[in-house]
Amino acid sequence: MVRRASSMGFESWWRRAESVGFCAHPIQLVGADEYRRDRVVWTRCNNRRAHICPSCSDLYARDTWQLVHAGAAGGHHGMPITVADRPQVFLTLTAPSYGAVHAATRGGDGKRGVCRDHHRIGGYRRCPHGKPLWCSTVHDHGEGRVGQPLCSECYDYVGHVLFTWHLPELWRRFTITLRRALHKELKATGVDPDGVRVSFIKIIELQVRAIPHIHALIRLDPHENGDDPDQTDWESPTSATKLAAIIEHAARTVTLALTDPTTDSAVRRIRFGTQIDTQPLTASSAPEKTGSAEQNSGIAGSLSGRRVARYLAKYVTKSLADLGISARRLSTEAIGDLDVSEHVRAILTTISALADKGLSGIKLRPGK
């Protein structure tokens, strides 16, 4: 290292690396200036994935924190400080259970617990394939078995893939359902529903069982007014607690009907899981509990805009690489050679099988 630092050209290299924030994959831009002289400029790759570029992903996470915090607490980036007084709810939407998986659990006292206590599941029961439905092991969070099915034959891989693929559409329908429910609630109380609008920011987090769930910050705003864009004197017609109740009801009622690809005529309904968490934010940062389990969102205790911003920024740099999957397209033939868990391999195999059935939108690159 000392030899390299004292070598010729090191200072020039250092200045170039420093100019792009020590990006792992800087991009060289070649062009001409206004006098038609050749010029070379280096710029960041701007990849948000931490495993590809730690520097750019860190910058992306910091930018995300700034944007979320500005929207939640105000006071910078053109957002008025009064935005913190508007009803805001931190929402977590999980996926349904498609089969029992190994888990790293903690009790109410914070101590680690056994994976699946036989007392909790009704004794030493086995699945139809003879696999035990209990697990007395205390798993660590980084352990390879965490997230793996207790019985891969029982696990509903088709449902897993369909939920993942149709999650964007399910979210879109949720936002429509929420706006309609809010419109109905405000109209019933004598408030003009056209005077408010709902703002969202969401990120996707991949659970250890390799299925996505959603974290979102939802805020109630006044409709834009050209004469007073900040509308600092606006008073919300409803509270954060009431907004949280409307959000939870919308999330529990929205569904998406699909033709089951495993049968000729059956219909499969895609919906969010039962673990839906809504946590209102208040200007005083004191949490208003709505009955949902706080641990579902990963944020316990006092909830503020700063904490929500930090939590969302933490996950925007994650990617499929955490499961051992490259961001590049895969061929069906390559699935068997991937260095991934059997659970992930089964998911990819299911995607391939559904693609062969001609399921809309799901495709794999054909082998060469």
Predicted regions and their residues:
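Short helix/loop capping segments that flank catalytic or ligand/cofactor-binding pockets
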Residues: 61-65, 99-104, 225-228, 320-321
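Histidine-centered divalent-metal-coordination microenvironment in nucleic-acid enzymes
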Residues: 53, 91, 192-227, 312
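Signature for HUH/AEP ssDNA processing cores
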Residues: 77-202, 206
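Helical (often loop-to-helix) elements that flank the catalytic cores of nucleotide-handling enzymes
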Residues: 217-266
